[in-house]
Amino acid sequence: MIRFAEKKDIPYIKELWDIAFGEEPDFNKYFFDNFFKYEDTLLYVEEKPVAMLQMMPYTLKGIGAVTYIYGATTHPDYRKKGLMGKLLKKSFEIDKSRGVKGSVLIPANQGLFNYYSKFGYETLSYVDTKVMKSTNELKYTVEKAKIEDLKSMAEIY
């Protein structure tokens, strides 16, 4: 069954989140404290939630309202059963009913580009990393973003 999250689902949602994204526990706590919403969290439930995705509302300049698919994951015991595909298709139906123009996502690794293309996603841009060597001529300090920087970064992007 596919449905939106309820309060009783939180332990299972956090378990799924930690399995998939456990390498950054500080960020996970930050996400749940600041961004998590039941009405944005779509679940696939088999006695308990076993797959999920966040349907975060977002506005793209020149396009308008879109859904940012975030935190898409399936419990390892339930993978390769098409559950994420069902969640994505349901999210498309919900978007259409809400008048949302589309959805975007950022695949976590190269292998996921092919997976998501099966559902109509296309690559719109690439992010490249450039290493800069520090010199005395720099007027600004460049440093790795921290959790506390996320809110101000979200305002820029």
Feature map (PLM): residue ranges:
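Basic (Lys/Arg-enriched) interaction patch that binds polyanionic ligands
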Residues: L112, Y116
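Short amphipathic alpha-helix that is part of the acyltransferase structural core
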Residues: M1-Q54, G64, Y68, V127, ...
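Short, flexible active-site-adjacent loop segments at beta-strand->alpha-helix junctions, enriched
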Residues: N109-G111, V127-T129
